[in-house]
Amino acid sequence: TDSIDLDAEIDKITKQKEALLLQHGYPADYLKPVYECADCKDTGYIDGRKCHCFEKLIVQYLYSQSNLKDVLEHENFSHFNLDFYPDDYTEEATGETPRDNMRHVLETVKSYLSGFSDTPGNLLLYGNTGVGKTFLTNCIAKELLDKSHTVVYLTSLKLFDILESCKFDRDLSQTRKNASLSYLLSSDLLIIDDLGTELNNSFTSSQLYHCIDTRLTNHRSTIISTNLSFDDLRERYSERIFSRITSNYTLLKITGDDIRLKKAIMQH
């Protein structure tokens, strides 16, 4: 009976409060909290699962952190055009026209993306300058960012700059160094673009091996794009780096003409 009396008293006070609000020109629910998201009441979770509002904020944050927001508005699968890849000659290396080769590359990439959450793999995109390797990695990055995966996208120059700072910069706090390394080694996907453009020395080789090996051990996905041939990769780095990549990555050769040059000619 005490609880019934208490409920009745609360109901009475609530009605008095609403009456006072209405009396002074305010809506009856004026003092109730106003939520940005009515579904989760701004907690970010519904029944232990991330609310759609939280997922949206994560995507926005990841885009801002990846430095890719503006680029990905134009470089994504909806803007991918196979017409830039010739179909009037066959490449000796693949036995296919560049267009058919790219179709098969896209099939492999789509399969990679569909299984990413369950079985994250690794890709090596290699081929001549301007054949669309960076464009394709941007397409992949957008797909995964849109699904709230953490994506770190770096040119090889930037990657080794960061690793060098973490190793030798005394002005950089240990907290900042740890955060940077954690981001590089633990993100769902690390994209290393244009491997081979950095100054090569024993430091870059050892750091590259550590990065690749740690991510493999932690089952984190890595995508590398490069203009280097297999022989160049082996010679420039080391046999063990070459072995780690060729044994654990899906190797995708991209053929064709320089698309950037084609676009420049078309614009003029």
PLM regions: where:
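Loop/turn-to-beta-strand initiation segments
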Residues: 121, 149-150, 186-189, 218-224
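Conserved alpha-helical scaffold flanking the Walker A/P-loop in AAA+ ATPase domains
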Residues: 110-115, 162-190, 206-214, 240
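Walker A/P-loop nucleotide-binding motif
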Residues: 120-136
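P-loop NTPase Walker A phosphate-binding motif
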Residues: 135-148
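Short glycine-rich substrate-engagement loop in P-loop NTPases that contacts/grips substrate
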Residues: 89-103, 123, 145-185
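Interdomain "pre-motor" coupling segment immediately N-terminal to P-loop NTPase/helicase cores
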Residues: 25-76
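Pre-Walker A (pre-P-loop) alpha-helix and adjacent loop at the N terminus of AAA/AAA+ ATPase modules
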Residues: 73, 77-123
